[in-house]
Structure formats: structure tokens, C-alpha cells
Amino acid sequence: MTMNETSAIPARQRENQFFEIGVVGRKTGFTVPRDVKKGDDGFEDMDAYFLSDGSIHLDEDNGDIEQDMPPVTRLQPTSPMAVNAASDEASHASSSDSSDKNPDIPSSPLLMNSRALRASRGSSGPLIVPIDHSAFQAEDEGTADKTKVDGNKLSIQPRKANRIVDFSRIKASPDRKKFEPRRSTELPSKIPSSTPKDDNVQESPAFPDENITALQKNVANFTSIKDSGGRDNLYIQTISKPRRSYVQNNKSEQTIKPSKQNKQKEEKKTISQGNKPNSRDEDSELSIDVPLSMLNRSLANNSQKNKKRTPNKPLQESSINSVKEGESNPVVKRKRGRPRKNKLEIGNSVQTSEATQVKGAKKPAIRNAKKMSNEKDDSLNSQSDSASGEFIKTIARNNLQEIKQVEREDTLVGVRRSKRTRIAPLAFWKNERVVYELHRDENRIPALPEVKQIIRVDDPSPSIRQGRKKRHAKRSGVEIKSNLEAKSNDVEEYDAFYKDEINCEVLSWNEQNPKASEERVVGYSLPSVNLQQISNQQLKFASLFKEEPSFAAGVVEMPAGAEKPVKPSKHNIMSFCILQGKIEVTVNATTFRMKKDGVFIVPRGNYYSIKNIGKEAVRLYYTHATDTLENKRRGIGDFPNER
């Protein structure tokens, strides 16, 4: 079923499909009236439209529904509800009467707001309608019969049915007829809730006295009713408290005139303010920790001295007249710089300076007199200000001396430093050790170990001290040149005897003619030796000496990263001397490394290999020899030429 079929109003097309006239909103609970009255200015009463109490009595009791329906937890409407325009007034009247008579129905906040608005406009109707207490008693008796407690179970009451309400009552009210739109200036001003109490406070016109008195009477009669459980049910809640507004009195302003006693007190305050020293200076002086009793005595003595030195001057009439009626005491500000001096003091100081002036002085007497007077005034002021400071400093010095004495005693006792005997490190591998013994003391009950002896071992060999080198005087440049010339001459002489090859005549080994001789090369300079490349290898060699078939010698050069492959020594004995570089040698199954000036051999019948592991070329001087007699016996051929 649609909404238009159930309603008495014929269906018509509207731009706004959410509301129809005379229909209660499904969520908001507002009832849209047929016509809205306008004021003299042509404005609609929007306050009454939005403060409509359509949801006031939606939870009222309905006797017929309660009798027919079984007890359920919640009721849901099966179809939307509609109301005719003719039945608006009756339904609204019945709902308002039943809501006033039934105390169990909670008052809607919209109703309370609308009633408060009427009261603020000055309507004659009461804010809250008085209720008969007999109705509460009768209803309590009826509800007591309905709700019964069986053990811990409680029967559930059926939910109250909803009822549709219109606003005919509000239309007929006097406020509605005399409606005029209010301006923002006519609205009640916002006043804070916490206002101070004062005799000049008056009640705000927004809440007239008549409405407030009626509200107080109703609240006094209708306080609270206790239910079956013994708890208080509050049926009325104050929505807004009466506000107070401050209104200016038309009475003449009352000025407080100071009395004679008040004047005297103010004069004393000004005097005390003028004679007080600077509080910041006192605080800075009192920052040292000093007993309060000593400070109070010192300050009292200093104040008496200051009174004798600088007596208080009488007040002038201008200072008394400056304190006006109703004004606070003027704050005396201290000017910067030194205070001005009186003319009498300057004159006296000038006379004394002229009397004591020495002849021949360059500066005039007046300047000297001014300086003397300034020094006197400064000394008087400094004495009064620093009297308390000097006393405090003396106390602080005494305290510091006591603290230093305590610290010295602590160091003697051994609080800051331990009494442990300090021992240099011991060479335990030389059997150096510490010998302890038990020390018994009358004051100490247990015996404590103490160091008896430290055993140290001296070196058997005496230390040889190196003597200081004698410092020779610097030689002159002539002597240095002569030494260089001598060295150059020696080199030239050596070069004259230096040769690439050395040939000489030697005896030849011959059994038949032992005196036979021959000429042979017996020496070479290595730079003059010409090296030859070995085929299929990176090695270079030069055969220098040969004695067939038993002996041979020469030089081998290996570049960086080169390697001589593994070869057998056979029946020869080989020896090598490293002239330059670093090599890695393998003899049989052993590998080792050698560098310059190293020598090694390869015995008969072993395999060997050589590898250059350095970054530069390696030079080796090699020799190999064989036993000819043994070779003949075994039937071995001539001397091999392998290198």
C-alpha cells in the first residue's frame, strides 16, 4: 500500500516527495501543517515550524492495543500512518491530555524547548501543568498487578503504540496569533553561567518573574516518587536556569573618600618605597647558604646604622597632594645614573678643596672638589648597601675553610685514595713473585695478609751502555770539495783496471807433459755477458766456464712470471746462487722460497723446477759437475750439454 491510498488527501505531484501535509515523518517525527502563517513583514514562523512537537506523544499508552497484543519486546509498524486534516485537532488534544496525565511518559526535549520559548516571549500559559498525585497512585497499583517477579525472572511489558499528532493546539494559542519575527537585537544576550554575586544584579527580562514563580511552585509540589525498587524517579528536569544580567544603576556614582588614617598609611608606604634598597641586589647577595638567625641579626644591625647615617626627610606637600581620590599609590621609579647633589654640599666641598689645594696644580679646584664629593657620596651609599654583603662574605669564607679542613682529613684517612701497595708488573717467567704474611692487629679481630717481600730476578748479563757520539765540527766547503775530488779519482783509477773479460796463461792438465801451459778466460763482468734465448722457453742463459767432461758454469735470467719446467739432474750435481730477484724452488717433493744472496743445490738423481715469484727479472749463477770415473765404470757416455 502506498501513502496516498491510505490518506484522505487526494494524491498530487509535489517537488518535495519526502513530506506530505498532515503526515508524520518516518525518522524525524515532525508533522507538516497545512498552512503556515506569516507575520506583518511576510516572513514565515520558522521557529514554530522547527520546534514542532510532533514526536511528543509517540510513546503513549494505548489501552486497546495492550489488551489485544501479546507481550513482545518491540513493535514494528506494518504500514505507514496518515492523518486527515479534520482529525488533527482531536488527536492533538487527546495526546496532550494523556501525556500530561501519564507520569511514566518522559517529556520530549522539543516540548520543553517550545514551552521555554513561550515563557521567554511572555505568554500567559504556565510552563509546566500541575499533575494530580492520585493518578500516580492508581497507575502504580495497576502496574504492580501487571509486573510480577517469579524468582529471578521478570515479565516483559508490551511496547507502547505510536500515535499521530498535529499542531492545531499551537495554531490556536495566543502566541501564534500575535506572532512577529524577532530581530537579532531583540534576542536575549548570552550571559556566562558563573556570575559573581552583587547587589546591582537584576533578573533578566528574558525570563519574567511570573513564569519563574510558577515553575518553582510546580517543582515544589511535584518532586519525586519512589518506585517498587525504592529508587527515586525524577519526573521533572530543569532545562535552563534563570539567568542574571548586569544593569547599570541610575544612581549617582559613590566615590570612596580616603580618611585620615588611610592617608597616613599611604604616606608611610611611599616613604618605605623610597628608602628600600634594590631587591635584586639583596637576592644576589643572599644566594650564599647562611643560617637565617645570623642573617636576621646582621640585617637588623645594618638597618639601625643606615637610619643614623641617612635620616628620613620630611614629606613635601606636593607628594601628599599627588595622591588623588580613588587612585592607587603612585609607584616610585628609580632614575638611572647617580643622584643629583644639593647646592650646599657642592659649596662645602669646593671650600674644603680650595683650602687644601696645592700650588702648581694643573687642574682647576672645582673639578677636584666635585670628584671628592662624588667619592664621599659613593662611599656612603656603598657602605649602606654592602654592610650586609660583607658580613655574609665573612661567614662564607669561614664555611669554605671548614670544608677544606674536612677534605684534607678525608685524604689523610684514605677515603679518596686506597692504601693498597702498588707493585710494578712481575716477570712470572723469571719466577718473580710477591710474598705475603698474616698481620695481627689488636683492633682487628681477623688476621689480614700483608705484603712481606717482592722477589725480582736481575738479568745475568750487565747492560752495555752505548757511549754518546762525539759531535764533530762542521767542515768548511773547501774540505768537502777535496773529498769529492779524491773519490772521483779513485773511481777513474778503478775504471782503468776494469775489463769485461780477464785472460791469462795457465797450466794445462796433462799426464804426459805436466809443464804444458795454455791461455784461458778466467773472469767475466756480468754486464758484459751476452745472454741467449732458449728455444721454446722464456729463459735466457750464457755458458761462461766449461771443463769437459766433468764441469760447467754459467748465468740464467728469468723474466717476471717465468718458470723453468721440471727436469732431472741425472748423474750431475747442480748448485745455484741467486744474484737478483725472488724465486720458488721445488726439489723432489719439497717446495721453498728464496731471495737475493741465497744458495741451493740439487743432488744426483732428483727432479727440480724454478719459478720467478717477484716483479723483476731473476738472475742465477749455476754450476754442475759429474764423476767421470764412475761414468766409465757404468758405461755412461760423454758429459751432457743440458742446462
UniProtKB/Swiss-Prot annotation:
Kindly report the protein's main subcellular placement as a broad class. Answer: nucleus
Start and end residues of each stretch annotated as Disordered: 55-209, 224-386
- For the keyword Nucleus, the answer is yes
Q: Which GO terms describe its molecular function?
A: centromeric DNA binding; kinetochore adaptor activity
Show the GO cellular component annotation of the record: chromosome, centromeric region; condensed chromosome, centromeric region; kinetochore; nucleolus; nucleoplasm; nucleus
| Residue ranges with Polar residues bias | 235-261, 295-304, 313-322
- Keyword terms: DNA-binding, Nucleus
Instruction: List, as start-end ranges, the regions of compositional bias called Basic residues.
Output: 332-341, 360-370
Pfam families registered for this protein in UniProt: CENP-C_C (PF11699)
Ranges annotated as biased composition (Low complexity): 85-97, 104-125
Listed Basic and acidic residues bias regions:
166-185
Gene3D superfamilies the UniProt entry points to: Jelly Rolls (2.60.120.10)
Which positions make up the DNA-binding region? 333-345
- Where does the UniProt annotation locate this protein? Nucleus, Nucleoplasm
Q: What does this protein do?
A: Component of the kinetochore, a multiprotein complex that assembles on centromeric DNA and attaches chromosomes to spindle microtubules, mediating chromosome segregation and sister chromatid segregation during meiosis and mitosis. Component of the inner kinetochore constitutive centromere-associated network (CCAN), which serves as a structural platform for outer kinetochore assembly.
Tell me the protein family, please. Belongs to the CENP-C/MIF2 family.
Quaternary organization? Component of the inner kinetochore constitutive centromere-associated network (CCAN) (also known as central kinetochore Sim4 complex in fission yeast), which is composed of at least cnl2, cnp3, cnp20, fta1, fta2, fta3, fta4, fta6, fta7, mal2, mhf1, mhf2, mis6, mis15, mis17, sim4 and wip1.
> What protein does this entry describe?
Inner kinetochore subunit cnp3
- Specify the species: Schizosaccharomyces pombe (strain 972 / ATCC 24843) (Fission yeast)
